[in-house]
Amino acid sequence: MAKTAAALHILVKEEKLALDLLEQIKNGADFGKLAKKHSICPSGKRGGDLGEFRQGQMVPAFDKVVFSCPVLEPTGPLHTQFGYHIIKVLYRN
């Protein structure tokens, strides 16, 4: 059976902005509010919520991080062809 996970993410074009957002989140800023304000991904409108997805559904670099990083700990920035991601895994099965 395939592994599944649920995650939030913020996607931006600039690494500097991603680093700044990660620092804000680690200092207590609301992930969802920052996603709504800054994310260029359509999921930003939902606070960065990607919902539940199966391992292998996302681009390989994103998939690798989601299925290996600590749950509920903001991680990043991760660079993909889409830009820079800040990721927060909500759960993994």
Curated annotation (Swiss-Prot):
Give the reactions, separated by semicolons, that this protein catalyses. Answer: [protein]-peptidylproline (omega=180) = [protein]-peptidylproline (omega=0)
Q: What is its EC number?
A: 5.2.1.8
Q: List the disulfide bonds.
A: none
Alphabetical list of Gene3D superfamilies matching this protein: 3.10.50.40
* Coarse class of the protein's main subcellular location: cytoplasm
Control of this protein's activity is summarized as: Not inhibited by cyclosporin A or FK506.
Give the record's GO CC terms. Answer: cytoplasm
Keyword list (alphabetical) reads:
Cytoplasm, Isomerase, Rotamase
Q: Which Pfam families match?
A: Rotamase_3
Q: List, alphabetically, the InterPro entries matched.
A: PPIase_dom_sf, PPIase_PpiC, PPIase_PpiC_CS, PpiC/parvulin_rotamase
Write out the annotated subcellular location.
Cytoplasm
State its role: PPIases accelerate the folding of proteins. It prefers amino acid residues with hydrophobic side chains like leucine and phenylalanine in the P1 position of the peptides substrates.
- What is the similarity comment for this entry? Belongs to the PpiC/parvulin rotamase family.
Q: What is this protein called?
A: Peptidyl-prolyl cis-trans isomerase C
UniProt lists the gene as: ppiC
